[in-house]
Amino acid sequence: MGESKCPVNFAGGGTRNKDWWPDQLRLNILRQHTSASNPLDADFDYAAAFNSLDYNALKKDLEALMTDSQDWWPADFGHYGGLFIRMAWHSAGTYRVFDGRGGAGQGQQRFAPLNSWPDNASLDKARRLLWPIKQKYGNKISWADLMILAGNVALESMGFKPFGFSGGRADTWEADESVYWGGEKTWFPKGNDVRYPNDDIYTRDLENPLAASHMGLIYVNPEGPNGNPDPKAAARDIRVTFGRMAMNDEETVALIAGGHSFGKTHGASSGDHCGPEPEAAGLEAQGLGWQSKYGSGSGRDAITSGLEVTWTKTPTRWSTNFLEYLFAFDWELTKSPAGANQWVAKNADAIIPDAFDPSKKHKPQMLTTDLALRYDPAYEKIARRFLENPDQFADAFARAWFKLTHRDMGPRARYVGPEVPSEVLIWQDPIPAVNHPLVDASDIASLKQAILNSGVDRSKFVSTAWAAASTFRGGDKRGGANGARIRLAPQRDWEVNNQPWLKESLAALEKIQSSFNGSRSDRKKISLADLIVLAGCAAVESAAQEAGHAVSVPFTPGRMDASQEETDVESFSHMEPVADGFRNYSTAPTRRRAEHYLVDKAQMLTLSAPEMTALVGGLRALNANYDGSAHGVFTSRPGYLTNDFFVNLLDMGTTWKPTDASGELYEGADRRTGSKKWTATRVDLVFGSHAELRAIAEVYGSSDGERKFVKDFVAAWNKVMNLDRFDLKRENVPARL
């Protein structure tokens, strides 16, 4: 019996729930990266381990590896630099701005699907080349950090000075299932029939939040859109994909021209000679894929992309040759040995070295996407400036490379290591350092009283604190309450925030802040960021106490206020939520329902299913819908922290029906009399409809459930309020996320 015909009568095999009900709301993404999958001790502190590393020795070992060519995978030109640059680039290059997912921060290139994407062919060999070094230094260096550092050392070993490097990327131990890579069922060179609404390569719009033109690519098709060798059309795709990775035109040109100053592509023959990708390969392959039967299968016979291009005559040294050749030659379309579209310089001498035969030379060659830098007017202007100003080119590439490889690391408070650059960059979302004594317990108590006596309904303080803190994204560690950017553009103008409660609560808090800070002789101050969180905590505490539950909501000062000048408006605009089910906000869904967006948001906030459930129920009880609506506010006591949401949702005396064909809004009526009782959204009703969520709701809706609910809500609230406090040691927030 062939392997594909093997029986599946084993644990976890057979037909699964998702096969029967493919549209079922899945909560698996809320159960990832926990201690159940992590082999390291619970108290393992990766940042501390990294700081104990002999960093210089590690870099020397990496530098030695660059020219230590192995027979089983020989180095092009005797140097692995190009391979390791590509590995680092592709590790970081999956990042996208709309949801903060992807990127290098978790070492996900080791796992499916990334380890088997067509665009990552042969990077399995790069990681195996690194294994002896990883084995030597053990847990002091994560795979996530090592892959990026190897790229930096590769640049250094070829004469380029990087901008810097930070460690701190803790490994995960399973494939991240939270990332939407696209709806396609095929990979590149197909694999784009869902992400684009039409086939017109000159007008099509890429689906959000994607940042690649095909399933299985990091960026775009190097042969041109859908294989069409049109540099101008390629420029359009490049601008979209690089833009969605947070790169502007200058950074894009710098990265392409700088990255292609090194190494080569591999297309000795057709990919038909290659075996299956790592995830489909046999056990004997030991995690390696694409094993080729063409010639030696490696070296001069290597097959990766199917393109066969060496860009410069100095592929192991930094130079401006790429830009020089780009503009010096006229280019004509040709084919690689594998039949792929590429370009060769007309009437040019053979000046490009062969990767393995020193007696051979080749004519300069380029990819369609390379020529986009010449034939797109905006890119051309930048590329010519870089050619005429090599120092500007080097600086731009160094900065863009640092941004590429560190974009998903979050604030500088997470940076560790001896090569962290001192310059503060706008894309790091800088926040001023604390420069004054912090408030103590007595101050906090008096400030709480001032907040509660301000005359502002406490639900508005809850809404404001949630609006500020819930911008956090676990993928790229951006957002959160620190910085008080809720008061700045663009956050204050987002539809979900541009409501009367924000203006009223901020005005009251600014008045309290001014009074407190102006009255002190001991230099103590409280930031608006701290005060926003404290107001939310005071409101929750008061709402619980008035409902009969004596609780203390934790609060730790130390946040500071960012300025508008320290806030990149365009960058933050990508973080505007499409939906926030926690406060019953949703724009028109596309191919997903509101409850799916809720789970998406919960995963960004690193919440578990019980935490998500407690927060939704509590925020409804506290009357914190973004627009003040009564949807899901299943209580006669709005503003009190009770379990009424769950009690009334689970009440069999209520029947529900949609208000229209969209199925977005529902009315609940008394089963006996038919009189209207409640209104609800899909997000509200899913806690009674979805079997797993209902099971949690039943715990909180039971006669003995309210005290536990209040306790769990306060814990989850505290977690969200502190998700961005990387300056604190937190036990209640998973450090490995």
Swiss-Prot record:
GO terms for biological process: cellular response to hydrogen peroxide; hydrogen peroxide catabolic process. Formation of the three residue Trp-Tyr-Met cross-link is important for the catalase, but not the peroxidase activity of the enzyme. Disulfide bonds: none annotated. The record marks 86 as: Transition state stabilizer. The active site is at residue 90. InterPro entries: Catalase_peroxidase, Haem_peroxidase, Haem_peroxidase_sf, Peroxidases_AS, Peroxidases_heam-ligand_BS. Transmembrane segments: none annotated. It is found in: Cytoplasm. The keyword Cytoplasm applies. There is a cross-link at residues 89-219 (Tryptophyl-tyrosyl-methioninium (Trp-Tyr) (with M-245)). PROSITE patterns: PEROXIDASE_1, PEROXIDASE_2, PEROXIDASE_4. Binds 1 heme b (iron(II)-protoporphyrin IX) group per monomer. Heme b binds at residue 260. There is a cross-link at residues 219-245 (Tryptophyl-tyrosyl-methioninium (Tyr-Met) (with W-89)). Its EC number is 1.11.1.21. One of its GO terms (cellular component) is cytosol. Keywords: Cytoplasm, Heme, Hydrogen peroxide, Iron, Metal-binding, Oxidoreductase, Peroxidase. It holds the Pfam family peroxidase. Its cofactor is heme b. One of its GO terms (molecular function) is heme binding. SUPFAM superfamilies: Heme-dependent peroxidases. The keyword Iron applies. Belongs to the peroxidase family. Peroxidase/catalase subfamily. Bifunctional enzyme with both catalase and broad-spectrum peroxidase activity. Homodimer or homotetramer. This is Catalase-peroxidase.
